[in-house]
Amino acid sequence: MNKKKALVLGATGQDGSYMIDLLLKKKYEVHGLYRKSSVGNTGNIDHLIQNDKVYNKNFFLHKGDLLDSVSLNNIINKISPKEIYNFADQDHVGWSYEIPSYSFKTTALSVIEILEIIRKKKQKI
């Protein structure tokens, strides 16, 4: 039996990490995407990274950026997930006031990019 395969965007955040835990309990193969700039900020998923029975067996991490459609496309094509969960966002509240265009790109335009990648893939996700 093939395992269900999911991609969780925003893997190191609170909601993304909870989703990863749930999917692993349901016997999924889970791939998590985390922003390159959040390296070292893996506290919410350290219990998985440090578990030799899970990490790189049922749970895999990928560095990426929602604003880089090429890397997103490459990751989605490489993994071929059946499900994608998007919990990613810019996590600095102050930035949303100081650089509103960045917040807009991260929360709105990135979703459009993800949907476009899925549409072009012509595979049911």
Predicted regions and their residues:
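N-terminal Rossmann-like NAD(P)+-binding domain of SDR-like oxidoreductases, especially those catalyzing
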Residues: 1-125
